[in-house]
């Protein structure tokens, strides 16, 4: 890659390599005077992230990391709704990403195992955290408009006991200074719940990946009102002396509203659940435009840095 960077005909480069190569190539590319677009996460270690961040701030070159949710229309509009108070105060954040696949790719020769399946080994990957959680933690900080102050978590190799080094199951809790918490979970041996970035507010809930929100006022029946309705509908022959005065509330009883008006075509697969355009093409187009104008993107490097250090 160093020979490529020596070319004066090249204005910018796209880096799509194993994570442990991000920092060396980004730093060399900036030093060579190239604009840079790099896959997430920012880098493998905290020191590498700091080196990239500091170098970028001293450079006049453009640097992007593929945080495509920042360019996804439903995420942008959803965040505007959240910050305008539509769902009230943000009181909790819940994110999950579930798959059912071993994350392996075919290896034609044993000596290529760690190069092809680099995501499975600690020297080249942070596992589920850097490969998946990085995107979702950026969304949480975006909604909360700050960084967590403390973290606790655990991970294990629960199912794919095939010689891999990174966990196939992780649970992490992040706490903000005001007590609001992120509950994060990811595993790759069950895909039932798919992927979601859920923002919980005192007046409603946003499910960002689906582009849907629910308002608490759409469903607010008191316990005594429920009991009266049950009697009225002859669910009970008489008022019970020790019967229930409430029933469990479930999401299905809330009215969903689309973040973006009009038809939203939803796709589902191993990687994403969301609108057809998830922001990936837009952020890449923005990078190309920045290469022409030299104008730096707002907050992309900062968000990539903050979400990566949480992984």
Across the structure, where does each feature detected by a protein language model lie?
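Short, well-ordered coil/turn residues at beta-beta hairpins
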Residues: 16-17, 180
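Predominantly a Rossmann-like dinucleotide-binding segment in NAD(P)-dependent oxidoreductases
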Residues: 58-64, 69-164, 174, 182, ...
């Amino acid at each position: 890659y160093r020979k490529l960077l020596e070319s004066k005909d090249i204005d910018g480069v796209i880096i799509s390599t194993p994570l442990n190569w991000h920092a060396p190539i980004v730093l060399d590319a900036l030093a060579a005077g190239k604009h840079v677009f790099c896959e997430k996460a920012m880098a493998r270690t905290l020191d590498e992230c700091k080196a990239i961040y500091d170098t970028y701030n001293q450079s006049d070159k453009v640097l992007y990391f593929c945080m495509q949710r920042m360019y996804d229309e439903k995420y942008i509009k959803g965040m505007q709704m959240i910050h305008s108070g539509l769902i009230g105060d943000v009181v909790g954040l819940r994110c999950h990403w579930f798959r059912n696949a071993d994350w392996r790719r075919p290896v034609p020769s044993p000596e290529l195992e760690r190069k092809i399946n680099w995501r499975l080994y600690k020297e080249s990957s942070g596992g589920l955290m850097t490969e998946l959680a990085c995107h979702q933690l950026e969304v949480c900080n975006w909604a909360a408009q700050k960084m967590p102050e403390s973290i606790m978590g655990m991970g294990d190799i629960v199912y794919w006991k095939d010689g891999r080094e990174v966990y196939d199951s992780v649970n992490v809790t992040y706490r903000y200074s005001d007590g609001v918490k992120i509950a994060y979970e990811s595993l790759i041996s069950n895909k039932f719940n798919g992927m979601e970035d859920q923002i919980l507010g005192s007046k409603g809930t946003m499910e960002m990946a689906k582009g849907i929100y629910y308002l608490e006022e759409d469903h607010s029946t008191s316990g005594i009102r429920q009991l009266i309705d049950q009697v009225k509908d002859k669910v009970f022959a008489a008022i019970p002396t020790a019967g229930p005065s409430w029933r469990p509330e479930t999401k299905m009883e809330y009215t969903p509203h689309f973040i973006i008006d009009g038809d939203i075509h939803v796709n589902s697969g191993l990687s994403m659940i969301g609108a057809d355009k998830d922001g990936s093409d837009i952020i890449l187009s923005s990078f190309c435009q920045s290469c022409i104008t030299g104008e730096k993107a707002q907050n992309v490097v900062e968000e990539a840095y903050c979400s990566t250090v949480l992984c």
